[in-house]
Amino acid sequence: MVKLAHLLVATFGVLLVLNGCLARQSLGVPPQLGNACNLDNLDVLQPTETIKSEAGRLEYWDHNHPQLRCAGVSVSRLIIEQGGLYLPTFFSSPKIAYVVQGMGISGRVVPGCAETFMDSQPMQGQGQQGQQGQQGQQQQGFRDMHQKVEHVRHGDVIAITAGSAHWIYNTGDQPLVIVCLLDIANYQNQLDRNPRTFRLAGNNPQGGSHQQQQQQQQNMLSGFDPQVLAQALKMQLRLAQELQNQQDNRGNIVRVKGPFQVVRPPLRQQYESEQWRHPRGPPQSPQDNGLEETICSMRTHENIDDPARADVYKPNLGRVTSVNSYTLPILQYIRLSATRGILQGNAMVLPKYNMNANEILYCTQGQARIQVVNDNGQNVLDQQVQKGQLVVIPQGFAYVVQSHGNNFEWISFKTNANAMVSTLAGRTSALRALPLEVITNAFQISLEEARRIKFNTPETTLTHARGGQPQLIEEIVEA
C-alpha cells in the first residue's frame, strides 16, 4: 500500500512537470539554454561563412556565437544575381526576411492548399515528356497550375512559416539582396538549436559548417531509391535520377536560361490589392465576408519602406515603421516582428529597451554609434555599426543609437509578434511617468533639476543628437 502511494505521488509529479512543459510550449516560451547567457561583452557581428552558387551566394553569421546562441536565432544574407533563381527550400523554424535591395517574385508551397494560379493558354510540346500513351495525350492541352506567386521589392518584410517551401526569382536589373532570420528557439522548431535547411531541389556542393555538416548537401529526393521515385511520380527511371541532381554542381541559386514564365499578377495590380486589403478608412467593404484571409491566402509580406506608412515621422530627424501581427497577421503565427528605421545626420534614437523580445539590428545603409547597457548598469557595447553588420540587443538591455553626419538606416527583427519598448527619455518615458519626489530622492537632486529631467525632452522616439542644451520648461508646456 505504501509503495502504491509513493507510485501515485511520483506519477502526479511527472504529470505536473509535463503539464508545465506543454504550457510553456503553447505560450511560445523558448526552451532553456544548456548554459547561461554570457552577455557581459557584446560585439558587432559580421558574416563568417560564404557559400557560392551559380547565380549568387549565401552568407552566414555564426549561429554558435554566444550572442546569437542566447537570442536563439540564426542570421543569413541571400544575394541573387540578375536572372537567378533561389530553388525551393524550407526550414524547421519560422523565418522572417527583409529585402534590402532589388526586386523579384516569390512563391511558397503550403501543404493542402489548392493551385489558385492557372495559365490562360495550354503549354505546347508537353506530350513528348513523361511516359508514353494516354499520359502524353492528356498533356497535349496541359495548363500550368501552381500556388500563389507574389512580387517582392526593396522594403518588403517577408514571413515564412516552418515547413513551407519557398523560392525566389530576381526579375530586376541588379542583385536581389535579402537578409533573413531563423527563429531556431521558436516553439515550432521541434529539433535542436542548429539551423537546418531542407532542399526540394538543388544542392550545396561546398557543404556547410553552419549546420555542422562538412559533407556535400543534396536535395531531399537524393536519398531515395530512384526506382521508388519513379514509381511514386509515375515517370521513367532516367527522369527520376535527374531529380536527384547527383551531377549538378550549380548550388542552390541557379541561372535561368531564357525567359522565366510563371503565372503572376501585374506589379501594379499587386500593390493596389494591398491597398484594398488595408484601406485607410473604416474596415468595411461590400465584398468582405470575413473569410477572405485563410492560411492559404494569407499575406506573407508587407512593405515598410514607404514614408507614408511610418509610425514615427519627423522631417529633420527620420522615421520609424513597425510591422507586427496587427499589420501582418501571419506574424502572430510565427511570433516574430520587425522595425524599419531611417535616422538622418546628427539625430538619435532616444534610450530605450525591449520589454518582451530580443532584437537583432542589421544596418542596411550608413553608420551610427550604438551603446548598450546590461542589467548591472555596465556598458557592454559602444561601437560604430556600418552597412552589412548586425548587433544583438538582448531583452531588457537599454540602448541608444546616434548618427553623426551621415544617415543611418536599419532593420530590426524581434522575437515577439507584438514587441513592446519602453523609453528612458522623452514624453512617454519611464522617467516622465515617475513623481518628482521619487526622482529627487532616487538621484539626490533638487526639485528643479528633477523637473528638467522630466520635461526637457518633448519628443517620444527621435531627437537631435546635440547635447547640453536645456530647453525651458515653460516653452515645452506651451508647445
Curated annotation (Swiss-Prot):
Entry keyword annotation includes Glycosyltransferase: no
Keyword Disulfide bond tagged: yes
Sequence positions bearing Phosphothreonine: 116, 415, 440
Cysteines engaged in disulfide bonds, as pairs: 37-70, 113-296
GO molecular function, one term: nutrient reservoir activity
GO biological process: seed maturation
Keywords assigned: Disulfide bond, Phosphoprotein, Seed storage protein, Signal, Storage protein
Region (Disordered): 117-144, 196-219, 271-291
Signal peptide: 1-23
A Pfam family annotated for this UniProt entry: Cupin_1
Biased composition (Low complexity): 124-141
Domain Cupin type-1 intervals: 42-241, 302-451
Role, per record: This is a seed storage protein.
Similarity comment text for this entry: Belongs to the 11S seed storage protein (globulins) family.
Subunit details: Hexamer; each subunit is composed of an acidic and a basic chain derived from a single precursor and linked by a disulfide bond.
Protein name: Cruciferin PGCRURSE5
